[in-house]
């Protein structure tokens, strides 16, 4: 009678392997990867300045993604070593495993992977460790966080090599203060990276609306990244060595050195400094042009538009200045007429005579301006002929 539990479902399922996948890192990278894919899809529709736009877009996304990755990914210092160790207590089993340490700004990641079994135990048979892989993360942002992590590790029964690493980070006495050095270095480096990210956000906004000022924020981003690397270099321990037993029963040291995130931020800092200086020099000499997001006339070009006046002698310059003065007087007169018309129209008592007078005055101004223009052109031709005749007369004499 299976409905009373006579034929229950099986309860001994095989243990599924946990995928080694960081979901938080995937979400953060998606924030920068999805806009890049969207831009690649619309890239064939970009007609003007395609190369400059693509380089700028990819560079800005790469800098932002690198800054966020360095904040969450524990890879500022790392090290790994093959060790001969005991896996569990009250057992004679000895295994060859690979232990690794990855140190970030606010956490430490310790891994232990089984390689092969060196000596078996007849008392506890049936221990299959071919799929053995530990990956534990511990917080180092607090003063006593590593001591608490060691306490929880002893309660949960972590392997001996991982407990040895936690002991090195939890000690805070005399020269055994590696955990405190990494905590202080991570704290100040974390603040410097967040400041660099704020400068990066400002550079994105300026690149869209005020491109001729974007080089300043890009330069600030690069300097902040270089300061973060310098702070981590000075405050972190010079060399962390954790002693273990090797495969041939010799002493081996697990050494933590600078890793991927440190060199990535250093490269991003140098790149931003070079780009900022290059854009600043080009802005000073008005070499390049960038269109704004809203196509504003003020920031359409890096430098203000200017034209050099033609030089043709003092008489020609005097004619140009005189023509400019007549044009300005005519424009001021037209503005006065328009303002008087608006005042009369707003009062509601605009008479036909005033309209006639205004039309007559505007007609007289147009005729006067045309006469002055013809007179200026004639005078300009006379001066030009005079300049041409002077060399001939001087040569004949």
From Swiss-Prot:
Pfam families: DuoxA. It is a multi-pass membrane protein. Glycans are attached at residues 109, 327, 330. Disruption phenotype: RNAi-mediated knockdown results in a blistered cuticle phenotype and resistance to iodide toxicity. Residues 324-376 are annotated as: Disordered. Expressed in the hypodermis, specifically in seam cells, the terminal bulb of the pharynx, the distal region of the gonadal arm, vulva, spermatheca and uterus. The chain crosses the membrane at residues 26-46, 57-77, 191-211, 218-238, 261-281. The keyword Transmembrane applies. Signal peptide: none annotated. It is found in: Membrane. Residues 351-370 have a biased composition (Low complexity). Its main location: membrane. GO terms for cellular component: endoplasmic reticulum membrane; membrane; oxidoreductase complex; plasma membrane. Coiled coil: none annotated. Residues 341-350 have a biased composition (Polar residues). One of its GO terms (biological process) is protein transport. It comes from the Eukaryota. Keywords: Glycoprotein, Membrane, Transmembrane, Transmembrane helix. Interacts with bli-3 and tsp-15. Interacts with csnk-1. Belongs to the DUOXA family. Plays a role in cuticle biogenesis. In complex with tsp-15 and the dual oxidase bli-3, promotes the generation of reactive oxygen species (ROS) and tyrosine cross-linking of collagen, thus stabilizing cuticular extracellular matrix. PANTHER family: DOXA1 FACTOR-RELATED, DUAL OXIDASE 2. This is Dual oxidase maturation factor 1. It comes from Caenorhabditis elegans.
